[in-house]
Structures are given as structure tokens and as C-alpha cells.
Amino acid sequence: MIKTTEHIVNNSIERDYSKSISLEHRKKFAQFFTPFPIAYAMAKWILGNKQLKTVLEPAFGLGVFSRAILSQQKEINIKAFEVDETIFENAKEYFDDFENVNILLQDYMYNDWKNKYDGIICNPPYFKFHDYDNKNILKEIETNLKCKLNGFTNLYTLFLLKSIHQLSQNGRCAYIIPSEFLNSDYGKLVKTYLIKSKTLRHIIVIDFEENVFDDALTTASIILCANDNITDKVQFNNIQSLQDLSKIDEIINKYPNFLETEQTYNFSDLNPEIKWKAYYQKQNSIKFKNLVPFSTYAKVVRGIATGSNEYFTFNLSKAKEFNIDEQYLLPCICSAKDAKTSFFTKQDFEELKKSDKSVFLFNAQNSTDKNISSYIQKGESEEINKRFLTASRTPWYSLENRKPAPIWVSVFNRSGLRFIRNEANISNLTSYHCIIQNKQVVSEIDIDLLFAYLLTDTAKQIFEDNSRQYGNGLQKFEPNDLNKGMMLDLGLLDKQTSDEILNLYKEYKYLILDNKNGDEIINKIDKILTDKYSEKKHWA
């Protein structure tokens, strides 16, 4: 039973639950609770439907959205779904006096397809494709929506698409979900459906410095939809903090009109094939001319995925413990933090090795060595061979065929991309992506010229247009984010300028290997490039 108004209009219920239920359990069911002020603002969008009688909350949790609605309008009939029995029992206790709230212990994605609702409001579970029954749920979507989606689609977007399908005439939908789908490959088909449905009205990107959801490392967006045929426009907005939530009120109160902003587009203007951050975030690339896709000069692929780093990675102590000869170990950078500067040398590798860091991968195909056989049997007894990746390999303990890449690039970043020249010529795990120069341009563009360019702020800023944003300023780049990202067309540089950059690069390398600061040199390279490629400049 909700005993006081205070419990309704804040997150004390969620805080009490989080204290009593383990983080492991909450993560298992993707329970990351929405701050009440955000839930309240989203509820206003639902309540803006003057014909509102029925509301659906597809992922009920502890009913923060229902509380937000009931605190503003008590006579609404609410139906809700929840799959976790623990939180379901808690929620039933809180809502047992509300006859107009019906909570069902059922999976929303497999139930209730034929019913329509005047309002649907939700913070759906954030599960990646391998964390839920994606084949069967995608089949449900395909059958009911006549929409075929990518097998890598995240569960939260499937909740959204089903809810849009269930809107009654003039019905409204408010979702808070990770922004990831706006800028990911699997999101293309989701965005296509949103455009085709013509229900999308607002995407409000929450650019908080702090995380919106406790314990969840993600950037969120509020998606507002309406099945009212009133407009063919969509508006993108950014809010920077909880103090800016009044902007959401302004957006809702203005509807069906929109705020005065350049970030308003017709459905026909939206391209589902591109990253939608182009619609809500200023693009760095517009400051430059003569840009080409990075894939023109190089290809980015992920590092080696073992399927079990604990089993496959080795240091000298582990090799000694299991009597594994070094000929069966592949030199590899196993931790991103072990490469500390822009150059990773053979000396760096030897120092890590002597420090007993993990710098090898088990690599023993076709060996008859009895110690190798014993270690393989150990893996099988621990069922390493049945893991998601290893189960599809023959033999299961074989490594992916990845030649050492001349350049590594960091996957996650807070202060811009890190590029590292792999002078030790060793392999890398997935904490770095591999950059391999295209064979057809090797004779045209020196690999050192490419690397010198990648070290500049200009290169990093242009790539930023293609990044994926997470909480607390964290950025992530998948290989295709970089492949499809833009870069200055270095092939247009004359020999004199190329030589000038390469000479500066040699100076920079000397300083770094001598443990000195080389920022001033990189700034000089940056200035040469911006002088050449700035939109305001003209080529000689």
C-alpha cells in the first residue's frame, strides 16, 4: 500500500527496493529505475490526450509511471505487465488499494497484441540480443507487425514498436530508452518503422553529465509518439540536466505546434540509414572540405574475441603453472591500459612480460604436447568449449585468424579516441580495434602519414560525429562507426606538405619514446591540416 503522497511523488519506493534486493538480481531483470521528475514529465504527454481512458505500462517495475499519472489524474484505468516475481509482489503490495490498476505477471512481448490503448508509457528492459529470447520475440514482431528486424536488435526497441502498434486513434506513447538505437546499425530498421508509422513526434536526448539510471552506463532519450495524424513533423531536442525538465513541459504544452528550432524535420527529410545524431548534434565535419570515408584509406576490424579471456590469456606464471611452452602462446595486448603512449614497442612488450602481465593467448592447434592436451581437457571440464563463441569453432580452442594490425584504436573513450602504433607487431584483444591500411593505397599514403593525421584533434573531432554516447561522457566506437566516419582526404596533399608532416611526426615519435611531451608537435601538424582543409580556405 502506498501510504503517503511523498511515496507517490518521489523514488523512495525504488530506493528501498534497491537496498533490499541485490544488484545482481536487478541487473538480471534490467531493473534501472526512472527518476520521478522524468516519469512525471512523460506522464504529462500521455495526459495530453483529451480522450484518455486506458493506459498501459508494459514494464511495470514499481509503477513509477502509474504513480506519476495517478498523482495528476486518479480515474485512469491502468493495465501493466511485469516478468520478475520479486518486484511484482512488491508492486502488488504498494498498489493493492488501487482498483483501477491491474498488474499481470506476464511477458508483454508474448501477450496482449490485439488490445489498443489511449496511452502507453514505459522504461523497457535494456537487453542486448544475446540476453533475451531474440529469435522467438523477433518472430512475434514479424508476425504481428509484418516487419523483419536485424537479429542484433536490442529488446527495448521491440517494446517500443509493439507499443506504437497498440495505440488507439489519438493514442499517445512515451518511452525512455537508451539513445543507442538512433546511431547503431540495428537501429536502421527500427527508425524505418518509426518513420513509416508517422506517429513519432519528439525525440528528446538527455545529455546529462550524470547517468539518468543508477548503475546503468547509458545515455537516454525520451520518445514521444501520437497516433493522431495531426502533423508530419518530428522535432529533436537536447536537455542537459534535471533542471531543464521544464523544457519537456514546454514541448508538450505547445503540441501540436513545435518549439522554434532548426532541429525540426519532415518525415520525408529523415534518413533511417544514417546516424540520427546528425539531427540533434552539431557535426564537426561541416567545418572541413575534401572529406572522404575512412574506409577509403583503411579498414577497421575488431580485435580477437576469445570467448573466455580468463581461459585463453596467459602470463609467464600461468604458462609455468601449466607447463605451456612459449611456442604455443601468441603475443597479444590483453588490457587496454597496458599501452600507455602513442607507441607500443618491443621493449614495452618485454617489460610487460617481465612484470608478469597477461601478454599471451593460448594458441595450440595441431599440437601433440601432453601439457597442451591437459590444458584443453581442463577447458572442456570447465565447459569453456560450450561458450557462445567457442561452440561455433573447430576446434573450439582455435583463435580467430587476425594478423597483427599496424595501428590500434581504443573502443571506449572519455577524452577522445586513442590511436596507438603497434611497433611490437603483436595481436590485440577486443579492447582495441585493428586499423589495417587498404592495399591499393599503400603506395599513395605512407602509414606514418595516416597515423600522424589520426593523432590530431581534427581527426578525433570528425570521428566524434559517428560516436555512440553513453553515460558520464563515455563514448564508444564500433568498427563500422569508424569505417563510415569521415576523414580529410590525405591523397590531396602535395609532396612538400606530406614531407613536412612526416618530419614533424618523426620529431614527435622521438619525444614520446624519450618520455617527453609531444603535444606541441601534434598541434603543428593539426594547424597544417586545418589551414589546408578548412571550409574557409581555398586550395592553391
Swiss-Prot record:
A GO BP entry: methylation
Classification via InterPro entries: DNA_methylase_N6_adenine_CS, MethylTrfase_TaqI-like_dom, N4_N6_ade-DNA_methylase, SAM-dependent_MTases_sf
Top EC category: transferase
Keyword entries, A-Z: DNA-binding, Methyltransferase, Restriction system, S-adenosyl-L-methionine, Transferase
Chemical reaction(s) catalysed: a 2'-deoxyadenosine in DNA + S-adenosyl-L-methionine = an N(6)-methyl-2'-deoxyadenosine in DNA + S-adenosyl-L-homocysteine + H(+)
Superkingdom, natural source: Bacteria
EC number(s) on file: 2.1.1.72
One term of GO molecular function: DNA binding
Pfam families: Eco57I
Keyword Ribonucleoprotein attributed: no
Quaternary structure (record): Monomer.
PANTHER family: DNA METHYLASE (MODIFICATION METHYLASE) (METHYLTRANSFERASE)-RELATED, DNA METHYLTRANSFERASE YEEA-RELATED
Family: Belongs to the N(4)/N(6)-methyltransferase family.
Name the record gives this protein: Type II methyltransferase M.AccI
Annotated source species: Acinetobacter calcoaceticus
